[in-house]
Amino acid sequence: LPKTEQIPSDFYRKGETVRAVVARVDNRNNNPKIILSRTSPMFLQRLLEMEVPEINDGLITVKKIARIPGERAKIAVESYDDRIDPVGACVGVKGSRIHGIVRELRNENIDVINYTANIQLFIQRALSPAHVSSLVMHEEEKKVEVYLKPEEVSLAIGKGGMNIKLASMLTEYTIDVYRELDEDAENEDIYLEEFEDEIDGWVIDAIKSLGLDTAKAVLNAPREMLIEKADLE
């Protein structure tokens, strides 16, 4: 069990029982060495199979797993029986099934979501607990622009960027997050005096002499007029 295959907070004493999954078998010079892993997504899947009978029985399948070992994980599950809620079955009553796995993984937070082949909906679910307002897909590039209300952006990104990183790993899409401006914000205007620290006073006076008092008025004014009348280029 190399250090690279251990959860960062793992600590073991000699003779202590370790739960892990076999990652690979190295056979060098006729000396086989079994390499174990606790950081592999497969380890989390095996723990789920042990804790959730419906997975072991084939009623629920684990479609995808993304992990930052010891920190956070996202799991996408699907049920083959309409009567079974796959997320509820994995979490258990009051979290009874998932809590044992969380403890085994050194308090790794685990989000369980419903899998769907609809990639737009899957991306929205992967970014939970944030609520997505709209998406712009670039399927050929495997990229997506996600628009959220300002108060939802930090939830989508997550602590240390973990939520968006895991969502990208789970969906296999590069996710760019943008703030969605409400209508009031879009309609707001700014008086030129508020730019005094960035723009020379004579420039502001020249623009105002044209009857342009706000930023939007300047943006909507013909470029030729600004150059000719206010001596701006």
Regions flagged by a language model, labelled:
Residues 1-233:
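RNA-contacting regions in translation and RNA-metabolism proteins
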